[in-house]
Amino acid sequence: MARPRHLRGLGMCITAVLASFIAGFTVGWFIKPLKETTTSAGYHQSIQQKLLSEMKAENIRSFLRSFTKLPHLAGTEQNLLLAKKIQTQWKKFGLDSANLVHYDVLLSYPNETNANYVSIVDEHGVEIFKTSYLEPPPDGYENVTNIIPPYNAFSASGMPEGELVYVNYARTEDFFKLEREMNINCTGKIVIARYGKIFRGNKVKNAMLAGAMGIILYSDPADYFAPDVQPYPKGWNLPGAAAQRGNVLNLNGAGDPLTPGYPAKEYTFRLPVEEAVGIPNIPVHPIGYNDAERLLRNLGGAAPPDKSWKGSLNVSYNIGPGFTGSEYSRNIRMHVNNINKITRIYNVIGTIRGSTEPDRYVILGGHRDSWVFGGIDPTTGTAVLQEIARSFGKLVNGGWRPRRTIIFASWDAEEFGLLGSTEWAEENAKLLQERSIAYINSDSAIEGNYTLRVDCTPLLNQLVYKVAREISSPDDGFESKSLYESWLEKDPSPENKECPRINKLGSGSDFEAYFQRLGIASGRARYTKNKKTDKYSSYPVYHTIYETFELVQNFYDPTFKKQLSVAQLRGALVYELADSVVIPFNIQDYAKALKNYAASIFNISKKHDQQLRNHAVSFDPLFSAVKNFSEAASDFHRRLTQVDLNNPIAVRIMNDQQMLLERAFIDPLGLPGRKFYRHIIFAPSSHNKYAGESFPGIYDAMFDIENKADPSLAWAEVKKHISIAAFTIQAAAGTLTNVL
């Protein structure tokens, strides 16, 4: 019986890979002994240099210009047309396959006939002030249609009315301050919070837990306006009428809210919308800082507790609740009329078949959808991905082929909760867990123009450093230096000043399902701002209509050299992972990281030294497991350096041990309340999805433990998660031992 079309997914994309597996594997592994000589090592390096020199800044510029002319929101016709354009180009570049893979997911849009806004109402219910509905279009885009107005996707609909309370960034600690120290109750109130510091979905969750009946989000100039820079279009700062779009889900890795854990195909069972995962039950709406100033101007109540609660608007930043003076009797009313509907989205999946190990995959993926034009997010990443695919295609057309299969992915609906990438990961989980070497993310290539930023698994640290040394720095004053040298000088690691900083992976982009759920080694790289001096959040015009091609060309990267460096780094990582005989992971770096993370979580626990003794909580099993892992890693590294490269079975065994190590840190039961976050060593912070947390089970169990109702139960939970972490690390160490 023919396989149903809708079940093909990855299989449709790599039919040639699987069909040639027996021949390729047999010929590559068993008939021809591997000849790893100086010549072949030199050949490997020469191909990498060809790849890097093939990439051109002007091509990235052209792709960015082409892809940002029109809005391409997930689920729209324009984004499908862009998917087809990318598919056509990949085929032209010489990829072996390029296919559209669709899913039917829940998306959220504003009501076209019933606008979202916030108003101030008098004692008679008359609206005396209304926030703006649209952002003024930038120069040259006045006639562009289908621009979605600012909104927060998946906000509940409704018209709550009540007193206003200012809650700073709506972080957990902000609500603790209000409730525990200032005795301010947010129950039944509408709260207003600044964007920044944490993921907006966490802000909404915190507001719900505090009992608020609605939350207004705005970008304060203190967080989104750099000193001495003009607002767009004269500079790259945020105009006062601009508002940041974004989803406010708390999916915790679930993917499509109606099909958590399973791909959203035609045959899939769906939850009723009222049972959908992660959707807030209160209205949420974003506004610009001009409108926010009007709402905050006459807030009464307590003064801000300290200067960290004050932004840069010309207001007192009083907390409320409610207004003072002539506006004493007035309230806030929210009008939110979003519509949630099941919508078809499209990923583009392309492949270059591996010559020797076609059943081993290296994935390079980035999202295509944007809120409006996507000048930075994501289309600098899309343009970079396109140039990498073109350059690999050029090598293939010249007769080269990677040792392992390379999969290119253009994801849809990332802005709606990482949906396209997660659904594809769910549909192909069994294949990916068995065969994937690594996932490299290709979201925005820039978020600033100061230096490189890398977040990755410790397995990739040394490879990142290696390829960064082989790429020229694009930075002014470093013309004869490498990317590694400029990165090291500008952002050294706080733990080791002799190496550049590499961050832990959190979430917020499409690597999430691959790393946090499936345990596939993952990494991301982009150019960023100077975090020591630039205190604004993200980049000022993030997720607004002013993210245009001109923003990038005129201000962020006029030469496109920063994006070229990112393309070369991402491309070189993919090349090394796909074509090196021995997978270029460094397991000893994982051992060092575990040692540091164990010491860090233990130091946090020392704040509760007496309680640790009272409840007989010991970290000894964790330290013992880390020690055993370190010894196993050292022994594995020794054997890896001695492996007979002419023995393909020996190489394959050790490569598989490396490939599967990240998988060994996966707990099938997941973290408490977050079952799709299954990595025991790393997870997004429970209080900020964007940030990575180490030993998240232990950390979450200890968070605010002094205020838990039952201390014995709370400390028992800490013991449990120390035990889980110790077991997992010990089991991972076991996977590194010599094969019997």
From Swiss-Prot:
The chain crosses the membrane at residues 8-31. Residues 264-577 are annotated as: NAALADase. Expressed ovary, testes and lung, but not brain. The NAALADase activity is found in the central region, the dipeptidyl peptidase IV type activity in the C-terminal. Its main location: membrane. Coiled coil: none annotated. Has N-acetylated-alpha-linked-acidic dipeptidase (NAALADase) activity. Also exhibits a dipeptidyl-peptidase IV type activity. Inactivates the peptide neurotransmitter N-acetylaspartylglutamate. It comes from Mus musculus (Mouse). It catalyses: Release of an unsubstituted, C-terminal glutamyl residue, typically from Ac-Asp-Glu or folylpoly-gamma-glutamates. One of its GO terms (cellular component) is membrane. It is a single-pass type II membrane protein. Substrate binds at residues 200, 247, 414, 507-508, 524-526, 542-543, 689-690. Homodimer. Zn(2+) 2 binds at residues 377, 415, 543. Belongs to the peptidase M28 family. M28B subfamily. Pfam families: PA (PF02225), Peptidase_M28 (PF04389), TFR_dimer (PF04253). Residues 1-7 are cytoplasmic. It comes from the Eukaryota. Zn(2+) 1 binds at residues 367, 377, 443. Glycans are attached at residues 111, 143, 185, 314, 449, 603, 628. Binds 2 Zn(2+) ions per subunit. Required for NAALADase activity. This is N-acetylated-alpha-linked acidic dipeptidase 2. Ca(2+) binds at residues 259, 262, 423, 426.
